[in-house]
Amino acid sequence: MSGGRRLPEPPLLVITDRTMTERPLADVVEAAFKGGCRWLMLREKDLDATAREALAAEIMAVAKPYGAQVIINRDYAASADGIHLPQGCSVSEARRLVGPGGLIGVSAHSLNEARSAAEAGVDYVTLSPIFLTASKPGYGPTLGLDGLRQIADSIPTPIIALAGVDADNAAACLKAGAAGVAVMGGVMAAADPEAATAALIDRIKRVQTSRQPSG
C-alpha cells in the first residue's frame, strides 16, 4: 500500500551527480530551483559519510529559500525531507528515521520490484530504465512507454519515470501513467541547468493543464 504522502509539485525529481557538472554542485542545484524544480535527490554515493553530511547541509541551505524538498539517497540527514532507498532496504526502519511526514522512495526496475516497494508502503517508486541513457547502464533492456504503462496500471503507488527522460518525452511518460519524471544528466550536464529545468517543467505543466476540466 502506498504511503500516501503528497509528492512535491511540480512532479519533477532532479537527481544530483556532481561529476557531470561544470560548476560547483550547489550552483547547478540553485539554477534548477530557479528553473522551477522543487524536488531534489542528493545522490553522491562515492563520498564518505562526513563529506556527504556536509554537502547535504549545503544543498539543503540552498533549497530552503525556494521551499524545495531534498531527499537523500541511501542515507538520511536530520533536516532532510526524506530518503530514497535501493531495493532490499527496510522501509519500516526508514520510516522510523524520517518520521510520519518524510518522503520515502525506492528504486525499481521491474513490475515485481515496484510491487514489492508498493506493498512496503513507500510514497513513490522510481522506475528505470524507461529509455536508453548513459547515466543508468547495467539495468537490462529499457522498459519503454509500454512497460511504464503496464507497471503504473498495476500498482497504486506513484511511479516516477527515470532514465533517458528529457523535455521531448516527459509528456509521453506522464500520459503513460507516470505520476512524475526524474532527470539527472539532463540538468546536471546541461550548459544552462535553469533553462533545461524550466523546459521540463513546461512540458509537465502542459499535461497537467490538459487534464483539468474546462469551464
Say what each PLM segment does.
Residues 1-84, 96-123, 150, 156-159, ...:
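Conserved N-terminal beta1-alpha1 strand-loop-helix module at the mouth
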Residues 42, 131-137:
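A short acidic, helix-capping loop that chelates divalent metal ions and anchors anionic groups
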Residues 86, 123-131:
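Non-cysteine beta-strand/loop elements that form the S-adenosyl-L-methionine
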Residues 89-90:
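Acidic/glycine-enriched connector segments
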Residues 136-140, 193:
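Short, solvent-exposed loop/turn segments at secondary-structure boundaries
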Residues 143-149:
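Short, glycine-/small-residue-rich phosphate/pyrophosphate-handling segment
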